[in-house]
Amino acid sequence: DLGKNHLFPGVLVENGGYAAIRSGVKGTFHNVAAAPIDDYSISCIMGAAVKNEGSRFSIDGGIELIFTDSRLQGVFGYGVHPESHTGGSGNTVSRAAGKEHAIRIALENTSFFCIAGAAAGGTVNGNIDISADNASKGKNNWGDFYRTGITGIGSGDNLYLPIGAVTVNGDINLSLFDDSCNTVYGGYFFTNTGDAGFVNGNISITIRDSGSR
């Protein structure tokens, strides 16, 4: 039970700092429970996050977050710390040698509010792969929790973040099986920081046996 904490399996960079990870960020979670969204329990779970303008990070080896049998609010490969509301354009996440994905998020039998591969300004060198299998079925009785959204590039709308757009040098792949969610975006860009967002690759969305709209 994570209570009212935020979870950063990889790195949190703040106060104008810089962090570099050379072997990637990987987290596997089972039976992680968050309180109802009305309690503002977990604003987000991120492989990496920036907290102040000017902070940035570089991750070689990619980010991978896997959840089973859990109840979550937001899951981001990388993004913006919810207390800061500022992003940065110097973030770079690159895939490991021999792998196609730079960011992978997989949910199984897990309820959520929002999933995003990347939700802050920066560059992703490699594919963004997001998959949800039996996500949000039979677990959502918390009102807004059921209003779920999946996006390859994060809107972050549940956090109301003024975030920069993301450039993806690769493909975005979204796969939903036996799920129930309201909104699915291949790419959803906020450009209010003045940056444009690009996907230099393909966007693929697969939905099967899902109550999505």
Positions of the model-derived regions?
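Surface-exposed loop/turn motifs in large extracellular/passenger domains
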Residues: 1-213
